[in-house]
Amino acid sequence: MNATRKTGTWLWALLAAAILTALLTATAFAGGNDFRCWTVDARQWTNQGYRSEKDGVWYLFLPADESLADTVLSFSGSVTAASAGTLDREHGTLTGAFAASDRVTLTLDGGKTVQICAKQSSLPSLRLTLNGTTLEQVHRDKNVKYPGNDLVVTDGDDVFTGTVEFKGRGNSTWREYAKKPYQIKFSKKTSVLGMPAAKKWILLANASDDSMIRTRLVYDAAEQMGFPYVTEYKYVDLWVDGEYLGVYLIGEKAEIGKNRLNLQDPAGAMFELDNGFATDEDHYFFEGRLNSYFALKEIVEEDDAHIAQAMSNF
């Protein structure tokens, strides 16, 4: 596939995904009548529904590989009628609601109606089930690592399962935005969505970029211009414990390694410009000409002599 066609393909997929994320950004669980809705698919994965504060519609964000026609909608609260599908009031379920349309209207006790809209994108799906913790707990400290979490990645008919360590990452992107970036780590080098195998992978939220294309365009341009060590990323829809978090970029963690930044010099090092947290690192310095702090993130040979040499070379 040529570069132009490849770029066009993911741009169309991303456009649809961006619409879903824009809807999600405006949503929150509604209070009041205690109505909630969710689905449980064939793999027993739960997908929570969200109520948009803009239009009052409840949205379900479903993986690309889930059949809308076979989706079983569950709900809390008393539902007396549905505009489509087979309603089971006793068990609080609605079967076949989205067989002909992506929208269904439910009538609640008292005559109030709620509209539910099911949405999907064509992006790969990445689902995490946390073990012994919650997303709220993870958000309290980005540095705490939580092992033993179940990961499922689906891309069309391809399904990958594994166990990963999960943690937060980032500096200003972690502090300033509700949509957080994360890191996952496998126990051994693992390929994700066809990218070169590695243990550590990052999930970029792109919270400050509503278009969600700036990062990808920069890396695609760098690759086409022949720059070495260009980070590879792919778009995914991310769920954690059934909560849809939006569109993320999963990609290689910037680190020294054969399939990453392949440095051979013992004093070969990777520094990060970091005016917010550099002084929290073990090794950092201030560059007066740039009026910026730089932190040593990684070095080939981690001993005092090579660290001193690397910082001097910089």
What are the residue ranges of the model-derived segments?
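Soluble non-cytosolic domains of exported or imported proteins
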Residues: 178, 208-216, 298-305
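Predominantly extracytoplasmic/ectodomain segments of secreted and cell-surface proteins
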Residues: 31-100, 112-117
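A conserved hydrophobic secondary-structure block that centers on an alpha-helix together
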Residues: 194-247, 312-314
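Gram-positive cell-envelope targeting signals
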Residues: 1-32
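Conserved oxyanion/phosphate-binding beta-strand-loop segments in alpha/beta enzyme cores
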Residues: 147-205
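N-terminal module-boundary/linker segments of secreted carbohydrate-active enzymes
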Residues: 100-104, 111-156
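Internal "kinase-insert"/substrate-recognition segments embedded within catalytic cores
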Residues: 190-191, 205, 227-229, 244-314
